[in-house]
A protein has these predicted regions:
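Active-site metal-binding motif and surrounding structural segment of the metallo-beta-lactamase
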Residues: 68-71, 92-94, 104-154, 216
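N-terminal secretory signal peptides and thylakoid transit peptides that target proteins
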Residues: 1-15
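Metallo-beta-lactamase
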Residues: 70, 94-96, 102-104, 162-234, 280-292, ...
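Feature captures hydrophobic
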Residues: 35-40, 412-415, 421-427, 434, ...
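Conserved beta-strand hairpin/beta-sheet module of binuclear metal-dependent hydrolase folds
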Residues: 65-118, 244-257
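Accessory terminal helices/loops
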Residues: 28-58, 172-177, 182-198, 202-203, ...
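C-terminal motif of bacterial Sec signal peptides marking the signal peptidase cleavage site
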Residues: 22-23
Length: 615
């Protein structure tokens, strides 16, 4: 069990009374409700598994109790309504909101709690990063009209808007992995009493909202709002666009996600993301240390009171991150590969014992080590046997044959499970599933192995992956088609679609081209958006679709439409056919029949079922 001394000390010491997290929310808006299903595979297999939650992980959830914490004279932090905290800084004649939560319903509840403290109007909102749990509750605190009228300024790093929209290129796979990562497809029985390591579970079905920033900066912004002097600094860490806020008058640091919620940080997320450079991260922590803050309010977890406590936490975090980075690089330079590195790179005792802050509720050392290797050297480990490996199915077929055949391997996997070795049981069953995806005895055995591993995990994200994979393997209550539809709804709310530029829409075509259908096709289509004074083109050229930054001189077809019409089409409120027939999309330079031919060369996103494990 964890050492509770630090858990209690940093969580409550000195916090004035009264005392309250994608991207990346847990259950994203619009994911399909999953049918009630047995929590274990034992209903249809002899490999019964007793459901449960690791006791330390369960106890960790106590820090996310819904509560308003007061820090200093004028700062209030709402913990427990969303994965991300929402912070209110009260000024002379208005308030500043820092981070808004993952969806609008919980944000409205937080706003109502804040109004019990003060009725001063919101004058500014600060997004500390682009992750959905920080930005998608914004309309619970502000209206688009007030922002447009200049009554409220929204401040963020200059790259935030691009970060919000750029992940659409890999939306289907990233959305699927995010659903697994945060338990979005799990049955109610498997999330009851759970937290997500860095915050509580988000409510399912919440509405994602967004208002674009109205003021951005690159490295540093010194600004006074409502009489509150603030120093905003760019601190790349959990997100590349992360910013922290130092309130110089009170000496209080709003540390964003640079320091997570009493857990080892996620130096690389399992859902997938661009490389997070650990060197940037610990240097960002050093930048925060230079403020010598009297208190620290993170965007996840509880506030920390006392300059010595703040320094101890910041120092140990930066040392842990640097230690993992440096020792991974050192051992890489000895020739070690990722599988070998995770066996030797561990936190030293003095850092590992800094509990609960270094417990692996959200991030882990091992996944950080693998990411560091990949970040420096890529996928190739140096053994040419990796260069032209046998296809996965053929390799599995040969291995199973060598092991004595399917029945022998299944029996060995069953024995491994019964002997308390679920990892080996799962590895053996994987070979059988590779050969035959419909081998249900093997699938149920692997699912039981994953449940055994998952229920024991201290890490919430690993638990989610194990149990989500088990659900896929078991098959009942799991519909990959519905999951894709739910993901599409989750990332195509009206506000998020409005934030997507016309250029981004057209730029998205190339990665969806069905190359096999266009190897003998050449076709150029132009797109005009007169209301935003933009025009682009797409040239299909024998299996490649090239984006053109300007309207091509010669086109086979040109479509003219307003950005607002494009948004209605993207949201499914209007079909392209009806838009053309209704005159809101004009077709020139070619017959309207060519429109269907052009769009037919591209895959529609979120229409292909994705299975991550049964393959």
């Amino acid at each position: 069990m964890m050492n509770r001394r630090r858990f209690l000390y940093y969580g409550t010491a000195g916090v004035a009374s009264p005392l309250l997290a994608l991207g990346c929310g847990s259950q994203r808006r619009g994911l399909p409700a999953t049918a009630a299903a047995p929590a274990a595979a034992g209903a249809t297999t002899p490999f019964a598994v007793t459901p449960g939650i690791n006791p330390d992980l369960k106890a960790h959830g106590a820090i996310f109790e819904r509560k308003i914490h007061k820090v200093g004279d004028n700062i209030y932090v709402a913990v427990g309504w969303s994965i991300c905290n929402t912070i209110m800084v009260v000024g002379d004649h208005g308030v500043i909101i820092v981070d808004t939560g993952a969806e609008v319903q919980s944000a409205r509840e937080v706003a109502a709690e804040f109004r019990k403290i003060t009725d001063k109007p919101v004058q500014a909102i600060i997004y500390t990063c682009f992750h959905s749990d920080h930005i998608n509750g914004v309309k619970g605190h502000a209206s688009a009209d007030d922002v447009k009228a200049g009554h409220i300024v929204i401040i963020a790093h200059e790259t935030l808007l691009a970060n919000v929209t750029k992940s659409g290129t890999i939306g289907p796979i990233l959305g699927t992995r995010t659903a697994y990562n945060f338990g979005g497809i799990l049955a109610a029985a498997d999330i009851e009493g759970m937290n997500n390591g860095t915050g509580p579970l988000n409510r399912r079905g919440g509405e994602a909202t967004f208002i674009a920033p109205t003021r951005t900066f690159a490295d540093r912004l010194d600004i006074t709002i409502a009489g509150v002097a603030m120093h905003l600094v760019h601190v790349p860490s959990e997100a590349a666009d992360e910013i922290a806020v130092f309130l110089s008058e009170s000496g209080i640091l709003l540390s964003a996600e640079v320091i997570p919620a009493q857990t080892f940080p996620t130096l690389h997320p399992l859902r997938g993301e661009a490389y997070r450079d650990p060197v940037d991260w610990y240097r960002s922590i050093d930048a925060l240390r230079r403020f010598k803050a009297a208190a620290m309010v993170p965007s996840h977890g509880l506030p920390v009171i006392g300059a010595d406590n703040v320094e101890e936490i910041l120092r140990n975090y930066r040392d842990a991150i640097q230690y993992v980075h440096d020792q991974t690089v050192r051992q890489m330079n000895h020739g070690l590969t990722p599988d070998e590195l995770v066996e030797v790179v561990k936190l030293p005792p003095h850092l590992a014992s800094f509990q609960p802050w270094m417990l692996e509720f959200f991030g882990t050392v091992s996944q950080a080590v693998r990411a560091i290797y990949q970040g420096y050297l890529g996928w190739f480990e140096g053994d040419p046997i990796m260069l032209a490996q046998l296809p996965r199915v053929e390799r599995a077929r040969r291995e199973v044959e060598l092991m004595g055949g399917r029945d022998h391997v299944l029996a060995a996997a069953s024995k491994a499970f019964e002997d308390g070795d679920p990892q080996w049981a799962g590895e053996l069953a994987t070979r059988l599933i590779r050969i035959d995806r419909d081998d249900m005895p093997a699938r149920r055995l692997k699912a039981s192995a994953f449940r055994k591993l998952g229920y024991a995990q201290i890490n919430a994200i690993w638990r989610n992956w194990y149990l989500s994979a088990a659900r896929e393997l078991e098959g009942f209550g799991f519909d990959p088609v519905l999951i894709q539809r739910g993901i599409a709804r989750a990332i195509t709310s009206p506000d998020l679609v409005a934030a997507l530029s016309a250029r981004a829409f057209v730029e998205g075509f190339p990665a969806r081209l069905k190359a096999e259908d266009t190897l003998d096709v050449t076709m150029t289509v132009g797109f005009r958006f007169p209301d935003v004074d933009e025009a682009y083109g797409v040239e299909i050229r024998r299996g490649v679709a090239q984006f053109e930054e300007q309207l091509p001189e010669k086109t086979n077809l040109t479509l003219t439409l307003d950005k607002a019409t494009l948004e209605r089409i993207q949201l499914g409120q209007l079909t392209m056919r009806d838009a053309i027939l209704g005159g809101v999309v004009q077709v020139s330079d070619g017959p309207p029949t060519e429109v269907a031919r052009f769009f037919g060369y591209f895959e529609m996103p979120f229409t292909t079922p994705i299975q991550l494990v049964v393959r």
